Every structure is written in structure tokens, then in C-alpha cells.
């Protein structure tokens, strides 16, 4: 993106954060609640078992980037996930990475990943609007604010990624985005029914 486009995206993020703060003040209301409690968020240190899984998923190419991990639960997104999975019989779940710029993480943690975020800088949408996950950590590192990140052009000494449990259906594997930049569910079903 051009410098002007990047500046406008950053201003949109900042405006979203100001409106988020206004919402926080309204939603917390109860002086006994923390902001995290008001938004249904629970943060806890990752257990040794969690860290072992994370390091395994990072693989040899990214294990040196690991610094610290937290377990984050958003009660609303967890409920939606369980509701979606319920009654579907046997479904496959896999762990996939999602990387994003540092300034996007409060919104992601608060609302979950959304198709068209209004107050986040979008680093790319190779296949149109969607929720993007990667099986390899290296791909997601490229979308963080970490110095040298490929897609986000990060300049920070740190970056954040999340390891998500994702319901995994019938995959549609592609090697490039030729003709797929405006992909949506209806078009996908015509091209690859059942995906």
C-alpha cells in the first residue's frame, strides 16, 4: 500500500480504539468489574503442556522466536465455537496460526476474528475477505509487527500470533490466487462442491 493508504489505515485503527474505549466505559458500568471481565475475557499464563504444544507447532524454523505465551479465552467466541460444533457428528479440529499487527490484537481478542474488521489494519486478503490461518508458523510471522515480517513490513522487536483450534472441513488446496481474489462461499461451491 502507499504511504497515504497506510496512514489512513492507522487513523482508522486509532479511531476504532477511541470508540472501543467509549464502549468499554459504557459496558463496564459496574465498578467492581475489570475491563477483561466486562468483555468476557480470561487471561492466564500458559501451562507447561500449552508451551510444549506451541513449541511443537512453531517447528524448527520458528522456535527461536518464542518468548512468552498466555491462554486467552473469550467466553462469547468459545460459546459460538461449541454451538457450531454441536450436533455436527464427528468433525476434525486442527491447530492453526494467525498472525496480525500488534495494534489489531485488542480488537481480535475482544471480538474474535471477523470477516471485515472496521478498526484493524488489514495486511492482505489474497483470496478476498476471509479468516486466514496457516499450518506453518513462518507464514503467520510474516503478518505480525515483528522486525522483518514480510507482509506487514514490521519494525518492532516483538510480534504476536495466536494458535487457534479450527474446525477443519474439506480443504480446497491452491498454489496461487489466480482468479480467486473475489472468492466467496457461493463461488467456492461451484468450483469445489462440499468445501
Where are these regions (language model features)?
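Short, small-residue-biased leader/transition segments that mark boundaries at the very start
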Residues: 2-5
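Extended, H/D-rich, highly charged conserved domains that either
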Residues: 7-93
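Segments that shape or occlude catalytic/ligand-binding pockets
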Residues: 27-30, 41, 71, 79-195
